[in-house]
Swiss-Prot record:
Annotated InterPro entries: Class-I_Pyr_Nuc-Dis_Oxidored (IPR050151), FAD/NAD-bd_sf (IPR036188), FAD/NAD-binding_dom (IPR023753), FAD/NAD-linked_Rdtase_dimer_sf (IPR016156), Pyr_nuc-diS_OxRdtase (IPR001100), Pyr_nucl-diS_OxRdtase_dimer (IPR004099), STH_gammaproteobact (IPR022962)
GO biological process, alphabetically ordered: 2-oxoglutarate metabolic process; NADP metabolic process
Protein's UniProt keywords contain Nuclease: no
UniProt name for this protein: Soluble pyridine nucleotide transhydrogenase
Subunit comment: Homooligomer; probably composed of four stacked rings of 7 or 8 monomers. Forms filamentous structures.
HAMAP family: SthA
Subcellular location, record wording: Cytoplasm
Cofactor(s) this protein requires: FAD
EC numbers for this chain: 1.6.1.1
One Pfam family of this chain: Pyr_redox_dim
Annotated organism of origin: Pseudomonas fluorescens
GO cellular component: cytosol
Cofactor note: Binds 1 FAD per subunit.
Family listed: Belongs to the class-I pyridine nucleotide-disulfide oxidoreductase family.
Length: 464
């Protein structure tokens, strides 16, 4: 057994692991990266964020072709199978792997591909694919192993018609009807994707509102859009059992209802990847969902062991995970890069997409903050009209007296890009965070960013 010594060992090469490894390496530390796959990138690159967003992009292109009258001159609407669309989308994975492999090489981070587990608080043993065991001894270890879909024991996920958000990418046909159980972010995103391919979708939600953490107006807009696009949303429903058939699946609900479809996609929660880490050897406990607890420095109860990304729970976003990993390493190397990551914009890649940052109306009302609202509807924006994307709006919440921007909520074309302008202003100190910025700034024309000026004028016109 070979023994290697490092300053920092990172478990997991997803966004959190990458952020941690790069920060530690750039601070001059000797760093090793361990990943259970034979390629870097983690679940984000291989099964999650990257393939699903690339898939969404391909579906949007198909939808634009099929709904734009201009293209009828060259033929009728085209329908593509799910495997064909996925094959096109998967091309980006190899490009991402190549880019990320280059990052590690340039920063002299040693890569170990195999199953890593704790032997003790400073030692990780890696069982490689060829059976060779490597021992890595480190001053500090960062757990960034991510998460996987939660699988209830009473559901047969080996059945060929039952999928989760990892295995759905192996779907070999296009179902006519699909049940999606779980209307969280992942469930809503896949509902949009399959609906865009002409699939009838039954979206089962165990709550009374879609994505209830969003501003209620944005949530309602998504619900309305779903209802117009072959997506039936069933609220306040819980599964009783799932019955797999030769030609489909029947979902039995506790309300007594039964839904039959060609396939079922389970999107109800995620579990931290900690069960194979030998956590009992270091005294770090995990909760019922396999997640570990950390402090604001991303340190566990063991002083030299840290955690970042999905494995620590909220907010379980790739963007936040990268910054959490970077901050965990910042706590170790003490180079001024640490920050507690809590100002994360929400990006939801439904069709149309959603993004927000800051407070929503419910939160401000509950806190008795005197706020006002400014809105810009995309149907009136020149750039949205040119792009043929009239659905959506930008909504700015601001303080009536100080004009401080308190929240930005966007639904529609390029929402995940648009939100960053508001985020930048909200992060300005003191009086520099003001709605007046949008009125006194010249925006390129025509752009979607111009919606900020329109919304600002709308909000100011409401004041008296």
């Amino acid at each position: 057994m070979a023994v290697y010594n490092y300053d920092v060992v990172v478990l997991g090469s997803g966004p959190a692991g990458e952020g941690a490894a790069m920060n530690a390496a750039k601070a001059g530390r000797k760093v090793a990266m361990v990943d259970s796959r034979r390629q870097v990138g983690g679940n984000c690159t291989h099964l999650g964020t990257i393939p699903s967003k690339a898939l969404r992009h391909s579906v949007r292109q198909i939808m634009q072709f099929n709904t734009n009258p201009m293209f009828r001159a060259i033929g009728e609407p085209r329908w593509f199978s799910f495997p064909d669309v996925l094959k096109s989308a998967e091309k980006v994975i190899s490009k991402q792997v190549a880019s990320r492999t280059g990052y590690y090489a340039r920063n002299r981070v040693d890569l170990f591909f195999g199953t890593g587990s704790f032997a003790d608080e400073q030692t990780v043993e890696v069982v490689c694919a060829n059976g060779v065991v490597e021992k890595l001894v480190a001053k500090h270890i960062i757990i960034a192993t991510g998460s996987r879909p939660y699988r209830p024991a009473d559901i047969d996920f080996h059945h060929p018609r039952i999928y989760d958000s990892d295995t759905i990418l192996s779907l070999g046909h296009t179902p006519r009807k699909l049940i999606i159980y779980g209307a969280g972010v992942i469930g809503c995103e896949y509902a949009s994707i399959f609906s865009g391919l002409g699939v009838l979708v039954e979206l089962v939600d165990n709550r009374d509102q879609l994505l209830s953490f969003l501003d209620s107006e944005i949530s309602q807009a998504l619900s309305y859009h779903f209802s117009n696009n072959n997506i039936t949303v069933r609220h306040n429903e819980e599964y009783d059992r799932v019955e797999g058939l030769d030609n489909g699946v029947i979902l039995h609900l506790k309300s007594g209802k039964k839904i039959k479809a060609d396939a079922l996609l389970w999107c109800n929660g995620r579990t931290g990847n900690t069960d194979k880490l030998g956590m009992e050897n270091i005294g770090v406990k995990v909760n019922s969902r396999g997640q570990i607890e950390v402090d604001e420095n991303y340190r566990t109860c063991v002083t030299n062991i840290y955690g970042a990304g999905d494995v620590i729970g909220w907010p379980s976003l790739a963007s936040a995970a990268h910054d959490q990993g970077r901050s965990a390493a910042g706590s170790i190397v003490d180079n001024g890069s640490w920050r507690y990551v809590n100002d994360v914009p929400t990006g939801i890649y439904t069709i149309p997409e959603i993004s927000s940052i800051g407070k929503n109306e419910h939160e401000l009302t509950k806190a008795k903050v005197p706020y006002e609202v400014g809105k810009a509807f995309f149907k009136s924006m020149a750039r949205a009209q040119i792009a043929g994307e009239p659905q959506g709006m930008l909504k700015i919440l601001f303080h009536r007296e100080t004009l401080e921007v308190l929240g930005v909520h966007c639904f529609g074309y390029q929402a995940s890009e648009i939100v960053h302008i508001g985020q930048a202003i909200m992060n300005q100190p003191g009086e520099q965070n003001t709605l007046k910025y949008f009125v006194n700034t010249t925006f390129n024309y025509p752009t979607m960013a111009e919606a900020y000026r329109v919304a600002a004028y709308d909000g100011l016109n409401r004041l008296f």
